[in-house]
Amino acid sequence: MPKRDDINSVLVIGSGPIVIGQAAEFDYSGTQACRVLREEGVRVILVNSNPATIMTDPGFADATYIEPITSEVLEKIIIKERPDAVLPTLGGQTALNAAIRLDELGILAKHGVELIGAKVEAIQKGEDRQLFKDLVIESGADVARSHVAKTLEQAVEFAEDLGYPLVIRPSFTMGGLGSGFAHTRQELERMVADGLQSSPTTEVLLEESILGWKEYELELMRDTADNTVVVCSIENVDPVGVHTGDSITVAPALTLTDREYQHMRDIGIDIIRRVGVDTGGCNIQFAVDPADGRLIVIEMNPRVSRSSALASKATGFPIAKIAAKLAIGYRLDEIPNDITKVTPASFEPTLDYVVVKVPRFAFEKFPAADAELTTTMKSVGEAMAIGRNYSTALQKALRSLEKRGSSFHWGPESRSVDELLETSRTPTDGRIVTVQQALRAGATAEQVFDATKIDPWFIDQIVLINEVADAVRDADELDAETLREAKDHGFSDAQIAEIRGLVEQEVRDARHAADIRPVYKTVDTCAGEFPALTPYHYSSYDSETEIVPSDRRKVIILGSGPNRIGQGIEFDYSCVHASFALADAGYETIMINCNPETVSTDYDTSDRLYFEPLTLEDVLEIVHVEQQAGELVGVVVQLGGQTALGLAKGLEAAGVPILGTSPSAIDLAEERGLFSGILDTAGLVAPRNGTAVAIDEAVVVAEGIGYPVLVRPSYVLGGRGMEIVFDTATLHDYFLRMADQGIIGEGKPLLIDRFLDDAIEIDIDAIYDGTELYVGGVMEHIEEAGIHSGDSSCTLPPVTLGRGQIQQVVDAARAIAEGVGVRGLLNVQFAIGAGVLYVLEANPRASRTVPFVSKALGIPLAKAASLVMVGTSIAELKASGLLPERDGSDVPMDSPVAVKEAVLPFKRFRTKDGLIVDSVLGPEMRSTGEVMGIDRDFPRAFAKSQEAAFGGLPLSGTVFVSVADRDKRSIVLPVLRLQQLGFEVLATAGTAEILSRNGIQARVVRKYSEEPAAGDSPSIVDLINRDEVDVVINTPSGRTARADGYEIRAAAVAADKALFTTIAQLTAAVASFDAIRAGFDVTSLQDYAIAREARR
């Protein structure tokens, strides 16, 4: 049937901040939905708390609300905007749970708003573990033996029936949060307690163990006429026991017989019908026992999921876009295929290639965490690759991770076969490389299967890769036949060079001399049956290319690769905006990226998309083919984070024009000695500092500066490897760890700075065109210096800096931009201590705050910067209206205040003892995402940011206080205010004594480490675990920051308590309590823009 005429406006609920298990794929889904709904003439109202998303740009919705995703806020938006319907199926678990809550509270019925995309009954059937289990059994399909428990006592009782080990799965959670395998009653009790806490319905499923079974997924879509398509089958290379988000996956499924696949397909279609998903998509997971072929259904997601984004990129079938159309009444056969233009969406995609996804982990950020992979998702990103066979796709995906040791290698291996096999028994990041090394060392495929339960077919493919490597090594010369064989199995020039004992350029020269270059094939959804009209390409060493020549001037934009802590969706935001701006300016835009989660890898974001690894070899080959197909103006490297910047020198050396800031200028900012010269010339001050490439040098520099010092490697993002070091012994230990990781050495010096304690940190984002500096925004960090800027909350405009100080910051940034030779974006970090402005670092590239600044002040920084890179002046951008005349350094007094807050993943990472890793913040970034609060003043904006990031602050109850000696003076006023607000105060003995002297009565509780006296009260950890504490204030003392109070902080995180580890954050929170009690107003970005124009 045609589009429904009774739906004229739709409220789309986004997924909120990037967290493990719910990442950039929902920005991709939501952006697609907003686009298609507006194309259909539907008024779109969007709510999302994440400013780093493309979907929250005002151009993608008619009313855009960057607000907390809570029932109260959603009702206010509904009252204000009067939507006809709410679409929750494209915003992950966050949106789905929010929609169910609106229904339960009667808010939808009260305001006459319909839920579209999935009915509440369908959501309940798909998400409620018991309902779904009953439904699968009714269909005649099989499930694992299981029980649903709502209490710990029930769980213990059911475990006796099921036996150990068993699986715990909470209801209505995402990314496997709170799930796991329990081998003992002690593990069961801990995991069930976590699971009940994580589940919004307080229930967990206890399931018989299916460890080691093969795992599969189907992506399905269904419309109101009961047309159902299976978009894609996905197979997990890792067996059951590893969360699918942490497993290497392959599409299409490769080890199923046709009969098995058809059986799985029939079950999937029957389930989607019984659940009642009839206006959208769903994902169903299956397991197959390799011993006897028994097939069971594990679970389903009655919404667009993480796997949906992967399936969309793998097939070219835009699941989110089609789901949005189905939600407003279309049938599948009424929706044309964007890629072919002649086939409808009711045609199932067909693949004539193989797609492999490999997860990206960040265990280096959490050294105390247990790195074993389980049913709780721990990866922070993923890379995807497309190849004509599995070995090519796998090798391309592994090198897309950009991690040392992540690709197969053939250098010396010190471990024995037995050691390698034993290591491979435990699923960890990089297990696939351990398997390759074990096979290379002489292990049989059978031994590897016994150790890992990875299907023998996948093991045989690694055997084949090793055989090809042997042939490359043993060849008399590196001839065309040998090279082509290696390339047909995905070997990079660097791998071939390692095997042959050559340098990479020698292999490249030999390959080019033999005229062996990749060709580029097209993702077309139909295995070549119909012509593809969207240029979405992948490389192959076949004979025929599918690149169409063009007479337009081209610009290549390098993306940022897989998400990781320190380099996430914020950089993709800048790449996407550059593509839009350059296309509007008449350039043909070419995107290179390998991240399936992002908007940049949508086939209609750029004129041409290459889904390829971001390595020098892969990028140079694309540059070559594009130069053959027309005029290439240059390559943009300053938007894709350190990934793209790291390729700048190699590209320039190969004669490729780099747009914007030159590689030599980038070096000026990164190389400490050169940058110090620029600061001296400009009369600017940096903290006392030095560099070292050897440990003896480092000790001399550190002792000359005086401890504590801040140490960090060069050329890294997200503060990787950054630490505060208090003595020489710690410096020795630090240096050895960094050197082992290969991030300190010749050409990569260690940077050593005086640590500025009690300083205010400031960020500025700006654009420089060689003549004029245009300030995007000046941000003041709420936490003191020493906490990474990516983890610190910040406010825009600043709330404690005077106009004179802001002007001083702007003047310093201008001098740095001129001295470095910036053309495009510049981010500079400063600190003000004892009245002195210090320059901490300058980055001549996009920063992670660009989206926040753009949303807070309505300045399209990334678009403007991309045009400056191709020669447009800031004066011309002002004249065109793209940039406002008044820049972000001059914010009117009555402007709204925006606060950015970081979201941290501590709850995902536990030690081997089961404790959550320490949540103390420091100079190494550990946040996965961010939220924004915006309102008329700082207290209200901060309150919104806390609501969006952590679910809000309690307005009454019990507060526990235990702080380091240095903070005892600062703690008095905030705690006094909390007591005045009605909080009962608990404290450890030392802190309670200080509070008492200042007129604050506190009940003394013992520390976790103190022995209880006879008849003594419970420890603070016991009280937190009993839910008798609402707010925890615990600041660690400097030298023992990682240990002091750790148990207290771990308990607070596990119990989802409000936790403050800095006085600055606490002070801001206390100031916001009155704002929270008064309630929030909601204002769209479009309304803020109208008010901004009126002020100009």
Swiss-Prot record:
- The residues that hold Mg(2+) 4 are E841, N843
**What SUPFAM superfamilies does UniProt report for this protein, alphabetically?**
Carbamoyl phosphate synthetase, large subunit connection domain, Glutathione synthetase ATP-binding domain-like, Methylglyoxal synthase-like, PreATP-grasp domain
Q: Where is this region: Carboxyphosphate synthetic domain?
A: 1-402
**What's the domain remark here?**
The large subunit is composed of 2 ATP-grasp domains that are involved in binding the 2 ATP molecules needed for carbamoyl phosphate synthesis. The N-terminal ATP-grasp domain (referred to as the carboxyphosphate synthetic component) catalyzes the ATP-dependent phosphorylation of hydrogencarbonate to carboxyphosphate and the subsequent nucleophilic attack by ammonia to form a carbamate intermediate.
Sequence similarity: Belongs to the CarB family.
Q: Which residues does the record give as Mn(2+) 2 binding sites?
A: E299, N301
What name does this protein carry?
Carbamoyl phosphate synthase large chain
Q: Where is the chain membrane-spanning? A: none
Instruction: Give residues annotated as binding Mn(2+) 1.
Output: Q285, E299
Molecular function GO labels = ATP binding; carbamoyl-phosphate synthase (ammonia) activity; carbamoyl-phosphate synthase (glutamine-hydrolyzing) activity; metal ion binding
Region Carbamoyl phosphate synthetic domain, annotated ranges: 548-950
Domain MGS-like, first and last residues per copy = 951-1095
